């Protein structure tokens, strides 16, 4: 009798545990569906650990986006992953460069420009390699991302000193943090970086051989899905996002980048002295890219 009682109790316990597990599974599935619906309805922006994304970081962290509207930042460390998210409709907006933007637009005509950004790129050489001129890139490794502004600038650097392209070894390193780390560890001869990674490299006494600012090239951009932005809810989200972005630009221009060093350190993974070295950087409010910059990207892509 005692054994029978113990057996019944054991069965009841197992049955109870089974119910709890099934109930838990059901609730977890329901929660996942709920969260997926909320994420789908939100305005999602793909961002990178780069300084051109600072207005988005500031607007989110300092509640400059109207809280009545759901705006979410999606974080990536490689531009290719940003573009994949955009092409697969996992985000509605993406911070990118004009070369990658034009490549996306060619594949999907529903993608268009929201704004240019203040991003600029520098070709930086490892101080140990002792390269003082672009012609010294011969037989050296250059880190970049294919079909991006860094790829285009690599061509520009090589062509400007009439080097044979096959004598400069292009190494595709998509993650900007890994690219910088390879320079710091002396695993790369040269690379193309934007801020704040470029500033950290400069503080380590690595040499700048090319700067898009001196070439009058403004290649940073934010793209969006044009058709979706005409829908009532999306348009409202976009209007709120634009206001928050512009307000963030005003704040940065008034207070300076260093005033938001905590945000740059948090999202870009650089040191405080790196942020403090970034002086006189201004952020423009929403304005479309210049046509001749777009044409520059198109012309380069047409040869690929």
In which residue ranges do the predicted regions lie?
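Proline/Glycine/Serine-rich low-complexity intrinsically disordered segments
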Residues: 84, 128-135, 158-160, 166-168, ...
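An extracytoplasmic/periplasmic, membrane-proximal ligand-sensing/linker region
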Residues: 21-30, 35-41, 51, 190, ...
